[in-house]
């Protein structure tokens, strides 16, 4: 399974460009149009990202086309000029964790993004667009804030949490067919 993220953010596109894509691209339509086995759309005021998993590689242009088509914007000649970024496999996982923790936000440390990721996950899950790969990835993401709160209370928890996270990463890598990664 190929895990990937394709998106636009405040780092790569101005507000007007981001708004063209934020209007409601649904994960189900991306599944149908681009051939993804799983898809989730995370749209915030500063980013629009598609997290997906597929048997064969889905191109960045295919995702851009789906986003443009779903937002009823003419896509002739636009996808080549748009500043999309793409992360695959472990880079995708690292990017998601940076985004959700607020490290990739316009205001570093922003906490709202994790809630937006949870809503995007619930929406995609309800529509049937989340499968086992994205389910494990996002559920692994959602346990981190609870662990962080416990770490602040006791230094011993830090060691257990690091060991637990290391074990989770190894299991996720092995079961997803993704090479081991660390961040």
Please name every model-derived segment.
Residues 79-178:
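Glycine/serine-rich phosphate-binding loop and adjoining beta1-alpha1 elements at the start
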Residues 179-183:
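Conserved class I S-adenosyl-L-methionine
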